Amino acid sequence: VKIAVLYASSRRGGNSERLAEVLVEGMDVDSLFLTDYRIEPIVDYRHTEPGSYPEDDYRKLLDRVLKQDLLIFATPIYWYGMPGRLKLFIDRWSQSLRENRKEFLDRMAGKRAYVLAVGDDDPHVKGRALIEQFRHIFDFVGIRFAGHVIGRGNRPGDIEQDAEALSAAREIRKRILAEMDAGSHR
């Protein structure tokens, strides 16, 4: 199983990153820190003659994502949604849909994804919209939504106090490792 973690936070060492570290401990993963990529906003050519798309790191990042079987989105909850960097990346999927819809959807189909979201202000309630947004995105492109964990944290390290979120991440880790082990015995 090829696994990538997409880290959406604007800072390294934050709570969503730590929660992801707990989940993927001991696994070989492709760590994709969105702060390492320059992703420009989508140029909407749906109803016009196509022009050129931005020259940025979108394709490089997308190529790494498309090689994976399992995607883990580790994100803070910013204003009840995902951070701008992650939204820009997903918005650009519209570019891939326009360029070669069938190929893009075929390559996305069959992937699984987990969402790890961390916020401070009643995240289990105020993070619901973010989780629903991911459900709709995954449904549209054919990714199976495997589950999510919502944790509480604001300052770096706060997630360490959320025993429920840490436990949930460890349970997902056990499931993934069991699936990987079962797959290696076939």
For each predicted feature, which ranges?
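Short, glycine-/small-residue-rich phosphate/pyrophosphate-handling segment
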Residues: 103-146
